[in-house]
């Protein structure tokens, strides 16, 4: 978004508590967490940088950023779509990836989306209903929505945004934190693969459409009490880190994005972070602090009993909801495969319950050896936390951007237990309760074919 200041005072950097995370700290923050990332190729790069940062303190290579649908990336695996199917730039492209750490205490999954709400997204939500409940969902969809679905794409995008937030509110458990990543700024010349040659005349207006779409998505996410990370704001001065295609970004930008995202998540979970002094980022300038419609935040306490900290703490109005174009699933009996005992960690080699609706067929009966991953049919269970990261005592200030949130800061039992739309927030069912209310779709193509790794 663009903010105009009436004052002639020079701009000054905005102080924030953004932390430059090390791999060991990311491992602690996401210990026993299931992270789901949904979106386009930029969100795939978000997934890749997070997977890499969970393992080592290094940056993605240009080849890794450019790769699409590869069979394996940094110990992850391609579950469906990509090279297992057909590589193309159509709206039916699918790619599902998953990373499970060797310890079994970190699970990250990625679904490629070409539209924010669709029949395919309903299949993804169905899959998440049967499997372990996500602890963190990171989602964005904008560029495809505004460029590949006809003349009324903005109107359709607004309707689909409302639908997706309603469905996320219905499906995700109370313990899940959802972060909506706003679309990053585009270049003046756009040659990204999502924009077909015959659609190049749209490139000029697409930059303005993204700003408008960001406004609608942030407003709706905030009204549904979901978090918003304004990447358009944060990266508007970082043009030297944007690729020549006008859409994608280099490895330095994506590592900065990961730091922003993880700082946001840690703050929402109430996790104490290591405080190290950093100089101002030379490629990020922020406006002076001002009122913003999406400022404020809410916290979510960790999903297990012991206090989670990377270091010891220091002493001291919208339109009514749109109708759904796809029939919503009806309740059905609980799944035939009950969850494993609650003291079982998420280790490789455990099978994922087969679903009779896995009939979509890019590749029949796909499976991977057990040592390559872990089956998501097991609930995450708290395990002992790794020891705190040794480091210097907190000192100094950090420089970084503002995180825009939808709700004022306070400490409830869950991140979304707030008043919304003039009434009390409806309590979402937790995963154990939702097992009674699971549903099956009527012969709808699943989010992926075959079996989950393991």
Swiss-Prot record:
Protein name: PC-esterase domain-containing protein 1A
The family this protein is said to belong to: Belongs to the PC-esterase family.
Organism the protein comes from: Homo sapiens (Human)
PANTHER family: PC-ESTERASE DOMAIN-CONTAINING PROTEIN 1A (PTHR14469:SF3), SARCOMA ANTIGEN NY-SAR-23 (PTHR14469)
């Amino acid at each position: 978004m663009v903010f105009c200041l009436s004052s002639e005072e020079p701009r000054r950097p905005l102080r924030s508590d953004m932390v430059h995370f090390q791999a060991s700290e990311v491992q602690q923050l996401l210990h026993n967490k299931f992270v789901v990332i949904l979106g386009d190729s930029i969100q795939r790069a978000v997934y890749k940088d997070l997977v890499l940062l969970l393992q080592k303190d290094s940056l993605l290579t240009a080849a890794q950023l450019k790769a699409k649908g590869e069979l394996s990336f940094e110990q992850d695996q391609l579950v469906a779509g990509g090279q297992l199917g057909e590589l193309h730039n159509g709206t039916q492209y699918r790619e599902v990836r998953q990373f499970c750490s060797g310890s079994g205490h970190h699970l990250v999954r990625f679904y490629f989306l070409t539209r924010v709400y669709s029949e395919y997204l309903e299949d993804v939500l169905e899959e998440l209903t049967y499997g372990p409940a996500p602890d963190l969902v990171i989602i964005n969809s904008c560029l495809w929505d505004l460029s590949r679905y006809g003349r009324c794409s903005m109107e359709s995008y607004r309707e689909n945004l409302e639908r997706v937030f309603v469905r996320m509110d219905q499906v995700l458990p109370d313990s899940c934190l959802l972060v909506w990543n706003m679309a990053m700024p585009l270049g003046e010349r756009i040659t990204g693969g999502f924009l077909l040659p015959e659609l190049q005349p749209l490139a000029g207006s697409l930059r303005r459409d993204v700003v408008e779409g960001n406004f609608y998505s942030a407003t709706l996410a905030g009204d549904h009490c979901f978090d918003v990370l304004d990447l358009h704001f944060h990266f508007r001065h970082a043009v030297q880190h944007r690729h020549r295609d006008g859409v994608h970004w280099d490895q330095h930008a994506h590592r900065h994005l990961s730091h922003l995202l993880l700082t946001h998540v840690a703050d929402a979970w109430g996790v104490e972070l290591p405080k190290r002094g950093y100089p101002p980022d030379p490629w990020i300038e922020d406006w002076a602090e001002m009122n913003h419609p999406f400022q404020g935040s809410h916290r979510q306490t960790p999903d297990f009993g012991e206090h989670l900290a990377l270091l010891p703490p220091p002493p001291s109005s919208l339109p009514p909801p749109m109708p759904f174009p796809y029939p919503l699933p009806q309740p059905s009996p609980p799944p035939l495969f009950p969850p494993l005992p609650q003291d079982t960690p998420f280790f490789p080699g455990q099978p994922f319950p087969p679903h009779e609706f896995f009939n979509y067929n890019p590749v029949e009966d796909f499976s991977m050896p057990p040592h390559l991953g872990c089956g998501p049919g097991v609930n995450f269970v708290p395990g002992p936390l790794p020891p705190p990261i040794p480091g210097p005592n907190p000192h100094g200030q950090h420089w970084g951007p503002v995180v825009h949130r939808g709700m004022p800061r306070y400490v409830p039992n869950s991140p979304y237990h707030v008043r919304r739309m003039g009434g009390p927030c409806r309590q979402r069912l937790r995963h154990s309760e939702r097992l009674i209310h699971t549903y099956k779709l009527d012969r709808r193509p699943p989010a992926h074919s075959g079996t989950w790794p393991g």
